[in-house]
């Protein structure tokens, strides 16, 4: 094990000098023994000097400190021992529940599976959330992105998806908290504990207060644990909150390493870094990884390079809209902007496909008529258009739904609506079977039966 010494410290970037014939490889993990800190090699500068990124706080480091090369990349424990535990980027427990028992450790840097090992799946995962199941269904082994600006409900929608799928799902789940609030990580842990599914979930946290090197690697640590379960012939759910913070950590690291920034100040390696992560989140013939990723949209601009780069990797995109959130409709999913590769008659069936398209057609027509209504009022519309507006407003309200995870805030018990009920209900609304009910009856209910009951009390 070769040793070197620190020659420069600039925030999270630390230069270490080794003997020329013992220069560490890129991605090797180095140990600063005295400070108990792990560094990861990012660049070889020459003359035995390597530039590294710290995985923890660099407070208290000084020049001349001894650094040991482990001759291997950062490795994390995989397997059953990680279930029910909270780990950091290095796979060390941070839940004060003793050491993690493991039989295997894996490097967090892995090559994606070979092309001939990949497997496709068209089996639909039922989420119990009406708007998701109807407009943007997702498949087992698929990748789903939850896009939204600040405060439109990404984390709550993701928690509901975890609640609904992880409880029904017999396999294991891995949750990677990348640069998010520590409070949310804490809430999530207790939510899982309360739901009795903690023994099927591995948690890896690198929250907002961590240095950029930590946040850049914590998604890979979580993914490595998920790959471990997949290679044991299991179906795994992988949740990442938030992919944007992964990109942002890359931007910080890139600037610290002195790279020239590209568009909007992002790192020049944005597409490559995103690809390295996303290409590994895939299903093979042994098992599947179904991933749900929250993606923060800076200033509600979907053309920003970070969300735009993420789009190309996903099978389904759930776009949360501030305009819909302002109407008090939650989940604030935009049914005209959200898409899914699975919304195909060959996958979901003709009935589901036609109902979803009919719903979108009615909502699109309502959107076009809004300007006319604003200027001239409802009375100037034709009878046909008046009907469309009436149905669209009912559909819009019926797309709202009380969540199980939000019950503590709203006092409304959460509702799980089966896919069959969802399709039948929307089909009936589009066909005008509920034209006689007031639109308020459709707001924040589960099934159509509840809307009928609610109408009686109005």
UniProtKB/Swiss-Prot annotation:
It comes from Francisella tularensis subsp. holarctica (strain LVS). The keyword Cell inner membrane applies. Its EC number is 7.1.2.2. Belongs to the ATPase alpha/beta chains family. It is a peripheral membrane protein. It comes from the Bacteria. It is found in: Cell inner membrane. This is ATP synthase subunit beta. It catalyses: ATP + H2O + 4 H(+)(in) = ADP + phosphate + 5 H(+)(out). Keywords: ATP synthesis, ATP-binding, Cell inner membrane, Cell membrane, CF(1), Hydrogen ion transport, Ion transport, Membrane, Nucleotide-binding, Translocase, Transport. F-type ATPases have 2 components, CF(1) - the catalytic core - and CF(0) - the membrane proton channel. CF(1) has five subunits: alpha(3), beta(3), gamma(1), delta(1), epsilon(1). CF(0) has three main subunits: a(1), b(2) and c(9-12). The alpha and beta chains form an alternating ring which encloses part of the gamma chain. CF(1) is attached to CF(0) by a central stalk formed by the gamma and epsilon chains, while a peripheral stalk is formed by the delta and b chains. The keyword Ion transport applies. Produces ATP from ADP in the presence of a proton gradient across the membrane. The catalytic sites are hosted primarily by the beta subunits. Signal peptide: none annotated. PROSITE patterns: ATPASE_ALPHA_BETA (PS00152). ATP binds at residues 148-155. One of its GO terms (cellular component) is proton-transporting ATP synthase complex. GO terms for molecular function: ATP binding; ATP hydrolysis activity; proton-transporting ATP synthase activity, rotational mechanism.
């Amino acid at each position: 094990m070769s040793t070197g010494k620190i020659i420069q410290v600039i925030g999270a970037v630390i230069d270490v000098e080794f003997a020329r014939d013992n220069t560490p490889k890129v991605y090797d993990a180095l140990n600063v023994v005295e400070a108990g800190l792990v560094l990861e090699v990012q660049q070889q500068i020459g003359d035995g000097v390597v530039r590294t990124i710290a995985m923890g706080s660099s407070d208290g480091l000084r020049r001349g400190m001894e650094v040991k090369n482990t001759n291997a990349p950062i490795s994390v424990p995989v397997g059953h021992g990680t279930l029910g535990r909270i780990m950091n980027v290095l796979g060390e427990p941070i839940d004060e529940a003793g050491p993690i028992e493991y039989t295997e450790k894996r490097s967090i840097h892995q090559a994606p599976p070979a092309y001939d090992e990949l497997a496709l799946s068209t089996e639909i995962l039922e989420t119990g959330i009406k708007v998701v199941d109807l407009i943007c269904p997702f498949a087992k082994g698929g990748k789903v992105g939850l896009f939204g600006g600040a405060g439109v409900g990404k984390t709550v929608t993701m928690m509901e998806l975890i609640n609904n799928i992880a409880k029904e799902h017999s396999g294991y789940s891995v949750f990677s908290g990348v640069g998010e609030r520590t409070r949310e990580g804490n809430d999530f842990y207790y939510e899982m504990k309360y739901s009795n599914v903690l023994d099927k979930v591995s948690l890896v946290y690198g929250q907002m207060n961590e240095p950029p090197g930590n946040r850049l690697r914590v998604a890979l640590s979580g993914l490595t644990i998920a790959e471990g379960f997949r290679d044991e012939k299991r179906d795994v759910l992988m949740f990442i909150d938030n992919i944007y913070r992964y990109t942002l950590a890359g931007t910080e690291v890139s600037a610290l390493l002195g790279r020239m920034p590209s568009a909007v100040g992002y790192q020049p390696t944005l597409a490559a870094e995103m690809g390295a992560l996303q290409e590994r989140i895939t299903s093979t013939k042994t098992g599947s990884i179904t991933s749900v990723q929250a993606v923060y949209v800076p200033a509600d601009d979907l053309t920003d390079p970070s969300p735009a780069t993420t789009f190309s990797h996903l099978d389904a995109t759930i776009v949360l809209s501030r305009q819909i959130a302002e109407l008090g409709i939650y989940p604030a999913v935009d049914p005209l902007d959200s898409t899914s590769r699975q919304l195909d008659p060959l996958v979901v069936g003709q009935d589901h496909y036609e109902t979803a398209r009919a719903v979108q057609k009615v909502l699109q027509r309502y959107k076009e008529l809004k300007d006319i209504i604003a200027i001239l009022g409802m009375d100037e519309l034709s009878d046909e258009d008046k009907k469309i507006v009436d149905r669209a407003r009912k559909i819009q309200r019926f797309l709202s739904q009380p969540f199980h995870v939000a019950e503590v805030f709203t006092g409304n018990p959460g509702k799980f609506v089966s896919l069959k009920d969802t399709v039948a209900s929307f089909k009936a609304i589009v066909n005008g079977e509920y034209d006689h009910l007031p639109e308020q009856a459709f707001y924040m209910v589960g099934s159509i039966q509840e809307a009928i009951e609610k109408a009686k009390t109005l």
